Design a protein with these regions (language model features):
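Amphipathic alpha-helical protein-protein interaction segments
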Residues: 106-137
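N-terminal, charge-rich alpha-helical recognition modules
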Residues: 1-111
Length: 137
């Protein structure tokens, strides 16, 4: 089940809401705000809690780089997330989040390889060799 109902993302003519969902992009009406582009969750001027889309994205996508589980968990459908992430107003934010996820995944992989090397398991020599070849140790 998604964090929000589909209706929260669709306007009266059936189009996906985009700018009105974000505090920083909705200029005249905060009725439909659900998210902030800030690093942490906040409360808007009317006392409504807004979730950090960046935080949600990083938490979900680090475990599934396809973004599918994130889309389903938050929006309930891939189409809504795809429309939001490809919107020109959000593209630069999305690119930075994607870059951070890629770095986080690499970091976790390197940590796992280093742990294998330290434990001296069957793959420890290969792990050590990889870390040395890549200049990570």
């Amino acid at each position: 089940m998604a964090l929000f109902e589909r209706e929260a993302f669709i306007n009266s003519v059936g189009h996906t809401r985009i700018k009105s969902l974000f505090l920083e992009l909705s200029y005249d009406n905060n009725k439909f705000q659900l998210f902030t582009l800030k690093d942490k969750d906040i409360v808007n001027s009317e006392g409504k809690p807004l979730l950090s889309i960046k935080k949600l994205y990083l938490d979900h996508v680090s475990n599934d780089p396809t973004e599918y589980t994130f889309a389903m968990a938050i929006f309930g459908t891939w189409d809504i997330w795809d429309t939001i992430r490809t919107n020109p107003s959000l593209r630069r934010y999305y690119s930075k989040w994607r870059e951070e996820v890629d770095v986080r995944i690499k970091s976790e992989a390197i940590r796992s390889i280093a742990e294998e090397m330290r434990e001296g398991g069957r793959s420890s020599f290969t792990a050590a060799k990889l870390l040395l070849e890549r200049g990570w140790i």
